[in-house]
Amino acid sequence: MSMEDYDFLFKIVLIGNAGVGKTCLVRRFTQGLFPPGQGATIGVDFMIKTVEINGEKVKLQIWDTAGQERFRSITQSYYRSANALILTYDITCEESFRCLPEWLREIEQYASNKVITVLVGNKIDLAERREVSQQRAEEFSEAQDMYYLETSAKESDNVEKLFLDLACRLISEARQNTLVNNVSSPLPGEGKSISYLTCCNFN
């Protein structure tokens, strides 16, 4: 694939405990699907989605990593080349939230110091089973200087907003020459292209 096919290429890696819905978020955004009974990711997988933002083609290489401890050494190797990390937890699972500091330590150890990190609370369609309040998560994200968003991969709530706002932020950072545009990774078949005319606040 030549550089003429896109203006920007960014690598986004989803991390977090097993079962929080990382694969479902990726498939909802890239394929418009919610896979019922989705099994745990084995190792690492990735998909491609091309979006158009303010007339520029942005290719997002979205990596879905396994959350199980036995795959941790594999997934850690993908941190370094990531432009952005989406740290995901399940709002109905207290344990997945309490593990966030451990994931942040891994980010600090293995990721670039210029990586953009976003905190996502998934499964808001199960609000009646919520174990982690939105206020608590917002306070945690503010303390860690992370953008926070709640999503539902099942209902598609805020999923597109998550990735497109992140793409806007990545473009802004790239223009300031604070990110390396990683174009060395192989690209599989593309997902659908969509347009996004304006960038939302993503600070």
UniProtKB/Swiss-Prot annotation:
Regulated by guanine nucleotide exchange factors (GEFs) which promote the exchange of bound GDP for free GTP. Regulated by GTPase activating proteins (GAPs) which increase the GTP hydrolysis activity. Inhibited by GDP dissociation inhibitors (GDIs). It is a lipid-anchor. It is found in: Membrane; Golgi apparatus, trans-Golgi network membrane; Golgi apparatus, cis-Golgi network membrane; Golgi apparatus membrane. Changing Q68L: Constitutively active (GTP-bound) mutant. Increased colocalization with group A Streptococcus-containing autophagosome-like vacuoles. It catalyses: GTP + H2O = GDP + phosphate + H(+). GO terms for molecular function: GTP binding; GTPase activity. Keywords: Cytoplasm, Cytoplasmic vesicle, Golgi apparatus, GTP-binding, Hydrolase, Lipoprotein, Lysosome, Magnesium, Membrane, Metal-binding, Methylation, Nucleotide-binding, Prenylation. This is Ras-related protein Rab-30.
